[in-house]
């Protein structure tokens, strides 16, 4: 829920008066209150989909009668799986996010929707070995949540054709990955993200997805140092 412009993980407390059913409460003009648990921004994992996953975990814990305090502390410190919508650093109110394991269209759609539904505009790096995929299902998610895409690697032309209907700005960087990261940053909106979520395998340009991630992180740090002297900490 949102309160005073802040998104929260929240729950509906069990009713204090047990005899009142929901229908009876409605007759009295009452509306259920929400108990605020933790600001969504306090989570290290990014995206509305991850916030929903956190709520599902809390609901299970609450259902068996365990206290939520320890679970909330664990969630606050949980950094997520490496290379899966993983925050890297932030500079000038633009956050770099590593989703190098986003090697298929479905994973990239989930990342775009998860970040976009939390109100953040996306500047995305796409491309590599497309493994014969149809990229057209990405077009709507890009139209809804992204402003810019830079395309890299062997299947850049195929991706461009598949997502042209999105109407967003598309540019190509060939095999110059560092240039692609710079281009994505240069086009990113304040408060938005630079997202490496390529929808492709890495083999045409890298040894594996981990090398792709490492080069993304290295370039992000270089950009941060050149812009501000040092990267901002990601909470």
Regions found by a protein language model. Name each.
Residues 13, 103, 128-131, 155, ...:
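Short glycine-rich anion-binding loops that position phosphate/pyrophosphate groups of nucleotides
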Residues 59, 206-209:
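Short, solvent-exposed loop/turn segments at secondary-structure boundaries
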Residues 38-145:
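Nucleotide phosphate-binding/pyrophosphate-handling subdomain across enzymes
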Residues 2, 186, 204, 217-235:
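Phosphate-binding loop of NTP-binding sites
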Residues 136-192, 231-235:
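C-terminal helical cap/extension that packs against the catalytic core
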Residues 1-40, 81-84, 88, 115:
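Extended acidic/charged loop-beta regions that coordinate divalent cations
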Residues 121-123, 195-199:
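Short beta-strands and strand-loop turn motifs
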